[in-house]
Amino acid sequence: MNVADGVGYSRSEVFVLVARVSFVAAVGFFSMKWIMNQLDPTNNAKRKAKKKAREQLRKLAKTDNLLWSVDMDQLTDYEMMIANHIVDPTDIRVSWENIAGLENVIQELKETVILPIQRKELFEDSQLTQAPKGILLHGPPGCGKTMIAKATAKETKTCFINLDVSILTDKWYGESQKLTSAVFSLAVKLQPCIIFIDEIDSFLRARNSQDHEATAMMKAQFMSLWDGLITDPSCTVIIMGATNRPQDLDRAILRRMPATFHIGLPNESQRMQVLKLILQHEPIAENVDIAKIAKMTENFSGSDLQELCRNASVYRVRDYLRTHTQDTYIGTDDEEYHDAVRPITMEDLLTSYKKMKTSKIHTGTLGIAKLELD
């Protein structure tokens, strides 16, 4: 009873009043939250990313690629955004057998990186034999750096995050730092974990006074979380980067990547191995001289050799289409088609080589001193 005003409220009236106020507050809260979500242009992308991340984590939990299950309800929204970039090794078709001419690099990578992860008990008594915190693959374009990363993801059977650095840049102040922090907090929860950054020079290039404040803060935080004062030395979180411009990387980044592997242009012997690997399942004529092609293709990368063989294979299909009418090859089944199409000949490879040599001359990717002046 309110004696001064002479107005009294029964217990039921007070309860109804509180219920109404609570209902209005709840409606206002959820309405405001819905409006904020609608105003956020990345809301749909975030929702899809979280859904994909949950599917990937559930898929990995059913395999041996996670040492222990992760409670997805305990992951933050930012960690779920990063988890969207987790790679399932079963989805990768590249293995060590698909890489030719880099046996020394692969063997060293297995011994210094993969073995300490897979057989951790063998290296527990020494800090010197622990897996490095950073790995740098550098060399000319098209020489197999990304293929090595793919094969590593498949063969290590550990959590592998293919980090898209564009996700770390956000227009809202402070969001980039939260996402950067989520990269490492998620990796620690999923360890052992490898974080792969392709074209790492575009993200962690040398710092200077021209850097934007947000970019400089993000780089500093990334390095601090990677190997800083509060970094747990027992954590098995490895950063693997690939670049063809190692000179552009910050010195502090190079210090954090002690395991460096130069993936250079293949020599004649390596080119022969690459050509044999590319053509091993292709129909080739008896006159094909792989050794001669390997000798001619100096300064060609593995990617160039792949394109050379692809063009040569296209020539034989083109000849088939020229000698057969449309009605003829539309009604032809697969077996008859493969019997009718001729194999790849030496002439196809030489024609493809001349075409690619001309293209490389115009783009400046073939040394003038190496040209054959007929």
Language model features with spans:
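C-terminal engagement/docking regions of AAA+ P-loop ATPases
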Residues: 3-7, 295, 300-307, 317-374
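Generic hydrophobic alpha-helical segments
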Residues: 25, 35-38, 116, 229, ...
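Short, flexible/disordered secondary-structure transition segments
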Residues: 29, 33, 37, 42, ...
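A short, hydrophobic/aromatic-rich structural module that often spans a beta strand
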Residues: 54-58, 247, 257, 364-374
